[in-house]
């Protein structure tokens, strides 16, 4: 399938500061994509390039096989929902949503119909005459989305548009955004630095750092199989320790061999081992893969977060529903499937090829 939108070898700098460094992105129609990364990684710049608010220094922005890098925003089938919503405070809800339609000189009947449909989609039917200043943050968010979708864009861009909401409302809006995207069937490209938000909303994620794409994939793929230490650390909690590959399916962590599911890595190759906190069980000290001492325990609502120090001085974070007494000796246990091996310096292409080889072995 041909991508709906592509960025090909795109670079962008501001005042000699390199923001995007030769990136390639393919966006297919009808999916929810998220650009995820820390502040300054280039994610909002990508959104601006797609919208037409910025132009690339080099490379091409391609829409339906046609270069649009120099096309102005009003000529692109793209609408943007900004972080601050950018609503007109002197206009009511109806006039805010109808603003773009009036510029297109549509008839009053057409405008009424489209505004009514858009308000219904965002669950604000009956709010047409409401003053913007009388609305809550969540309602303003819905008005901004309605104003964007009323123009029937092929792509909807959302620039950290949930960040101003409180936690409960943000969670509610996540469900609503996902439902809205499914109903409309158009492409959403969402920018956030919130890992949990990205995992919850997305069909596909682009993880960025320093103007480069670190990894692309589904939320499950990226969480379960991070390509490098940055991704493993940025997406959720991780225990990361240095190791050495003994042979296929066996890795050595500071002198002790552990079974794993990784293969195709040279023997004695230095690697980094990732084990997620929720994949570690606390058991009796003598029954564990190794022993550790409980250093601290915090209650996180749905689980306890327990920090343990092993006899080599490494700190392990465990998420469990069981309590443990600070200062007590415990055993740590994890299955071979819980171990994920990262090879320092391995490119995403090399990493993907290695992971695909596991699937070929499983299917053989």
Curated annotation (Swiss-Prot):
Its EC number is 7.6.2.11. Pfam families: ABC_tran, TOBE_2. PROSITE patterns: ABC_TRANSPORTER_1, ABC_TRANSPORTER_2, POTA. InterPro entries: AAA+_ATPase (IPR003593), ABC_SmlMolc_Importer (IPR050093), ABC_transporter-like_ATP-bd (IPR003439), ABC_transporter-like_CS (IPR017871), Mo/tungstate-bd_C_term_dom (IPR008995), P-loop_NTPase (IPR027417), Transp-assoc_OB_typ2 (IPR013611). Disulfide bonds: none annotated. It catalyses: ATP + H2O + polyamine-[polyamine-binding protein]Side 1 = ADP + phosphate + polyamineSide 2 + [polyamine-binding protein]Side 1. It is found in: Cell membrane. Signal peptide: none annotated. The keyword Kinase does not apply. It is an enzyme of class 7 (translocase). GO terms for cellular component: ATP-binding cassette (ABC) transporter complex. It is a peripheral membrane protein. GO terms for molecular function: ABC-type polyamine transporter activity; ATP binding; ATP hydrolysis activity. Part of the ABC transporter complex PotABCD involved in spermidine/putrescine import. Responsible for energy coupling to the transport system. The complex is composed of two ATP-binding proteins (PotA), two transmembrane proteins (PotB and PotC) and a solute-binding protein (PotD). Belongs to the ABC transporter superfamily. Spermidine/putrescine importer (TC 3.A.1.11.1) family. This is Spermidine/putrescine import ATP-binding protein PotA. It comes from Staphylococcus aureus (strain NCTC 8325 / PS 47). The gene is potA.
């Amino acid at each position: 399938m041909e991508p709906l939108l592509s960025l090909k070898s795109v670079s962008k700098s501001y005042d000699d500061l390199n923001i995007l460094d030769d990136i390639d992105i393919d966006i297919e129609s009808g999916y929810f994509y998220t650009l995820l990364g820390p502040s300054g990684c280039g994610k909002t710049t990508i959104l601006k390039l797609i919208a037409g608010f910025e132009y690339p220094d080099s490379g091409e922005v391609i829409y339906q096989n046609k270069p649009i890098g120099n096309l102005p925003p009003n000529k692109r089938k793209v609408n943007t929902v900004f972080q601050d919503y950018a609503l007109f405070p002197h206009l009511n809800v109806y006039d805010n949503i109808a603003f773009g339609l009036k510029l297109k000189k549509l008839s009053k009947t057409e405008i009424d119909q489209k505004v009514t449909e858009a308000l219904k989609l965002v669950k604000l039917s009956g709010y047409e005459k409401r003053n913007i200043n009388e609305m809550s943050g969540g309602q303003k968010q819905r008005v901004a989305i309605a104003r964007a979708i009323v123009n029937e864009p092929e792509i909807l861009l959302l620039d950290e548009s949930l960040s101003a909401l409180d936690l409960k409302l943000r969670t509610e809006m996540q469900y609503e955004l996902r439902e809205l995207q499914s109903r409309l069937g158009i492409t959403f490209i969402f920018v956030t630095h919130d890992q949990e938000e990205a995992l919850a909303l997305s069909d596909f994620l682009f993880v960025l750092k320093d103007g480069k794409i670190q990894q692309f994939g589904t939320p499950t793929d990226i969480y379960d199989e991070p390509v490098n230490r940055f991704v493993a650390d940025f997406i959720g909690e991780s225990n990361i320790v240095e190791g050495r590959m003994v042979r296929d399916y066996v890795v050595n962590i500071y002198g002790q061999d552990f079974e794993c599911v990784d293969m195709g890595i040279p023997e004695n190759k230095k690697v980094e081992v990732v084990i997620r906190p929720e994949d570690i069980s606390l058991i009796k000290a003598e029954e564990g893969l190794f022993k550790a001492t409980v250093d601290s325990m915090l209650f996180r609502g749905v689980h306890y977060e327990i920090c343990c120090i092993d006899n080599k001085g490494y700190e392990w974070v465990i998420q469990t529903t069981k309590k443990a007494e600070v200062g007590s000796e415990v055993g740590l246990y994890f299955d071979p499937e819980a171990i994920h091996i990262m090879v320092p310096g391995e490119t995403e292409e090399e990493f993907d090829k290695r992971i695909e080889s596991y699937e070929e072995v499983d299917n053989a």
